[in-house]
Every structure is written in structure tokens, then in C-alpha cells.
Curated annotation (Swiss-Prot):
Apoprotein for the two 4Fe-4S centers FA and FB of photosystem I (PSI); essential for photochemical activity. FB is the terminal electron acceptor of PSI, donating electrons to ferredoxin. The C-terminus interacts with PsaA/B/D and helps assemble the protein into the PSI complex. Required for binding of PsaD and PsaE to PSI. PSI is a plastocyanin-ferredoxin oxidoreductase, converting photonic excitation into a charge separation, which transfers an electron from the donor P700 chlorophyll pair to the spectroscopically characterized acceptors A0, A1, FX, FA and FB in turn. The gene is psaC. Its main location: plastid. Keywords: 4Fe-4S, Chloroplast, Electron transport, Iron, Iron-sulfur, Membrane, Metal-binding, Oxidoreductase, Photosynthesis, Photosystem I, Plastid, Repeat, Thylakoid, Transport. GO terms for biological process: photosynthesis; photosynthetic electron transport in photosystem I. Residues 2-31, 39-68 form the 4Fe-4S ferredoxin-type domain. It is found in: Plastid, Chloroplast thylakoid membrane. Its cofactor is [4Fe-4S] cluster. Its EC number is 1.97.1.12. This is Photosystem I iron-sulfur center. It comes from Spinacia oleracea. Binds 2 [4Fe-4S] clusters. Cluster 2 is most probably the spectroscopically characterized electron acceptor FA and cluster 1 is most probably FB. One of its GO terms (cellular component) is chloroplast thylakoid membrane. It catalyses: reduced [plastocyanin] + hnu + oxidized [2Fe-2S]-[ferredoxin] = oxidized [plastocyanin] + reduced [2Fe-2S]-[ferredoxin]. Coiled coil: none annotated.
Length: 81
């Protein structure tokens, strides 16, 4: 399974995504761009299971997780065997 995780600029530093993640792929890092002075880090996508709990927990739609199963990806690219 491969994952593409998009991070947008609307993080408010609430830590909801970090607390929701069952595999701890996110962490908060210092950032001066919001009141909380922290932002969710880029996730370790190799450990992401694609459950989208972080996305569901986010109150500002900061995270977008797209999960592609290998056979679906190859089929959509015309590479299915």
C-alpha cells in the first residue's frame, strides 16, 4: 500500500491529529505561524496505515490522506497484470 499525505497551511496546533493516530506517524514541531506556536510535522508515510483518523480528527481540514492500494493504482494506470 502506498500513501500520499498532503499538509495544508491551516494548522491551528490543536494536536487532535497527533492524538488520533494509532501508529504515531505525526508529531508536533515548533512553528511561529499560528497561535499555538506548533504545527503537525510531515508524517512518516512508510508507517502510515491509511486509517484517516488524523484527517477525521482535524477541525480545520489541515490534513488530507489519500491511500492507494497497489492493485488499484496499477489498474488505473493501465499496468494491471
Amino acid at each position: 500500500m502506498s500513501h500520499s499525505v498532503k499538509i495544508y497551511d491551516t494548522c491551528i496546533g490543536c494536536t487532535q491529529c497527533v492524538r488520533a493516530c494509532p501508529t504515531d506517524v505525526l508529531e508536533m514541531i515548533p512553528w511561529d505561524g499560528c497561535k499555538a506556536k506548533q504545527i503537525a510535522s510531515a508524517p512518516r508515510t512508510e508507517d502510515c496505515v491509511g486509517c484517516k483518523r488524523c484527517e477525521s480528527a482535524c477541525p480545520t481540514d489541515f490534513l488530507s490522506v489519500r491511500v492507494y492500494l497497489w492493485h488499484e493504482t496499477t489498474r488505473s494506470m493501465g499496468l494491471g497484470y
